[in-house]
Regions:
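Charged docking surfaces used in two-component/phosphorelay signaling
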Residues: 17-25
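C-terminal output helix
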Residues: 108-117
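Conserved acidic carboxylate
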Residues: 10
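Short hydrophobic/Thr-rich beta-strand motif most characteristic of the beta2 strand and flanking loop
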Residues: 27-34, 42
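Active-site beta3 strand of CheY-like receiver
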Residues: 47-52, 57
Length: 151
């Protein structure tokens, strides 16, 4: 079984501790950091499988940290889920442009967070998809209305 180590970078002590407890109860192994600099130090000692990162941090912004990580020869392959109180297409685009792999708006449902994290770690392993003929597609039937990030 692959590691479920996750680096949670969140400056709010209450939210950081709460996320740590919830993620632990869901089978994840959280590493907690309150700042960008602390996150960089912890990455060197305990490389995670995925990063959940607030975009507003006290020292290095989440945008700056994502840019640093995506340029790093070792850490650039670690998926980053951006968490921000800003919502909408502009916020999403800004996070993705900085190098984040996905985006979630605060507040969020734990089930949505868990689904996003699972998708990110699953996406690490490339899968070959072979299409042998025309597919019937029902985009309305595939939509999960409980996911606010779903179009």
């Amino acid at each position: 079984m692959l590691s479920k180590k996750i680096l949670v970078v969140e400056d709010s002590c209450h939210l950081r501790e709460l996320l740590g407890k919830i993620l632990t109860s869901r089978g994840w192994d959280p590493i907690l950091a309150e700042s960008g600099r602390e996150a960089l130090a912890k990455l060197e000692c305990q490389p995670p499988r995925v990063i959940l990162m607030d975009m507003r941090l006290p020292d290095i912004s989440g945008f700056g940290l994502a840019t640093i990580l995506k340029k790093h020869p070792v850490h650039r392959s670690i998926p980053i889920l951006a968490a921000t109180a800003s919502a909408g297409d502009l916020a999403r685009q800004r996070c993705l442009s900085a190098g984040c792999d996905d985006f979630i708006s605060k507040p969020f449902a734990i089930s949505v967070l868990e689904r996003r994290l699972t998708n990110l770690v699953s996406a690490e392993t490339p899968k070959t998809i072979v299409v042998t003929g025309p597919r019937k597609c029902d985009p309305i039937g595939e939509k999960d209305s409980s996911d606010p990030g779903c179009w």
